[in-house]
């Protein structure tokens, strides 16, 4: 087995994690058992893959875009009956293993240049369900993205992404990761996070989720502006003031100061108002 002559390719966002302690923390955070079937996206040279297979899981199914790395990985793990590998773009191809049976966990050092669309594919988005509901994802992310996922209302990192992910999942931080832990070293710091998507039955009504998404798109266009300005396009000011009074918020607050559940409450009130108007007009 050899990866000789293969250098990290910038267009693929390749930065290989080499720190053994961090690799072990990632595997530990996954809480793996013999029945687990794990999806790994962007295995690179197989450092994390090796650790996952040593944990005695039922299957590690890896997806790698770089065709040269696919060859090297097949050589390295050719003897492993619990390993399967598919070459291709994780944003486009099926994530299912060859046997067609779904995996239940995702453990990956995600290429930073596809973080947002890949995260959306793995956990879904407001108003839409993912192809598979994974029990747990342990992801190595760019620290800036991880901080947005974990941020609380009022913190500088709190954003529309914070609201979206927190309405779909429960998340926690595992550890920060220095650029020195990679080869080549990225220009940014990283963080390992655990993400546990809610069961489909625990999610909000689809119409309410879509309404929340619409509100977020409108409100966070003017992140630094007050709600009375950012939401002015969706309702007359007197209606907005009435809704704010009912919910105990102020239109002088900014979008990043409003909690995820308060966005849900606002979406429900507006949804009910529109429904009532529709009934009256009919």
UniProtKB/Swiss-Prot annotation:
Coiled-coil region(s) at which residues? none
Top-level taxon of origin: Bacteria
- What compartments host this protein? Cytoplasm
Per its record, the protein catalyses: adenosine(1518)/adenosine(1519) in 16S rRNA + 4 S-adenosyl-L-methionine = N(6)-dimethyladenosine(1518)/N(6)-dimethyladenosine(1519) in 16S rRNA + 4 S-adenosyl-L-homocysteine + 4 H(+)
Q: Which residues bind S-adenosyl-L-methionine?
A: 15, 17, 42, 64, 89, 109
- Principal subcellular localisation of the protein: cytoplasm
EC code:
2.1.1.182
Keywords recorded for this protein, A-Z: Cytoplasm, Methyltransferase, RNA-binding, rRNA processing, S-adenosyl-L-methionine, Transferase
Q: A Gene Ontology MF term for this entry?
A: RNA binding
Transferase in keyword set: yes
PROSITE patterns documented for this protein: RRNA_A_DIMETH (PS01131), SAM_RNA_A_N6_MT (PS51689)
Name the InterPro entries on file: KsgA/Erm (IPR001737), rRNA_Ade_diMease-like_C (IPR023165), rRNA_Ade_Mease_Trfase_CS (IPR020596), rRNA_Ade_methylase_Trfase_N (IPR020598), rRNA_adenine_dimethylase (IPR011530), SAM-dependent_MTases_sf (IPR029063)
A Pfam cross-reference name = RrnaAD
Which top EC class applies here?
Answer: transferase
Q: What is a single cellular component term in the Gene Ontology annotation?
A: cytosol
| Function according to Swiss-Prot or TrEMBL | Specifically dimethylates two adjacent adenosines (A1518 and A1519) in the loop of a conserved hairpin near the 3'-end of 16S rRNA in the 30S particle. May play a critical role in biogenesis of 30S subunits.
Q: What family name appears in the similarity comment?
A: Belongs to the class I-like SAM-binding methyltransferase superfamily. rRNA adenine N(6)-methyltransferase family. RsmA subfamily.
**Record-given protein name:** Ribosomal RNA small subunit methyltransferase A
């Amino acid at each position: 087995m050899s990866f000789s002559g293969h250098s990290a390719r910038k267009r693929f966002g390749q930065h290989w994690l080499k720190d053994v302690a961090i690799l072990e923390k990632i595997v530990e955070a996954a809480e793996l058992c013999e029945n687990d079937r794990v999806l790994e996206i962007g295995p690179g040279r197989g450092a994390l893959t090796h650790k996952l297979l040593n944990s005695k899981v039922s299957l590690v199914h890896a997806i790698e875009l770089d065709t040269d790395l696919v060859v090297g990985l097949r050589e390295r793990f050719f003897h492993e009956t619990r390993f399967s590998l598919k070459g291709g773009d994780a944003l486009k191809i099926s994530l299912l293993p060859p046997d067609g049976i779904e995996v239940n966990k995702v453990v990956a050092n995600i290429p930073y240049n596809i973080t947002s669309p890949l995260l959306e594919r793995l956990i879904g988005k407001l108003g839409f369900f993912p192809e598979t509901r994974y029990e747990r994802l342990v992801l190595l992310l760019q620290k800036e993205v991880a901080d947005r996922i974990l941020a609380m209302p009022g913190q500088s990192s709190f954003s529309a992404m914070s609201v979206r992910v927190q309405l779909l999942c429960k998340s926690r931080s595992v550890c920060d990761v220095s650029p020195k832990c990679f080869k080549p070293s990225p220009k940014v710091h990283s963080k390992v996070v655990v993400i546990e998507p809610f069961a489909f039955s625990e999610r909000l009504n689809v119409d309410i989720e879509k309404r929340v998404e619409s509100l977020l798109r409108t409100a966070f266009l003017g992140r630094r502006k007050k709600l009375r300005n950012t939401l002015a396009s969706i309702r007359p000011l007197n209606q907005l003031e009435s809704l704010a009074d009912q919910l105990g918020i102020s239109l002088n607050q900014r979008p990043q100061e409003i909690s995820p559940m308060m966005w849900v409450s606002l979406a429900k009130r507006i949804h009910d108002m529109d429904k009532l108007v529709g009934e009256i007009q009919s």
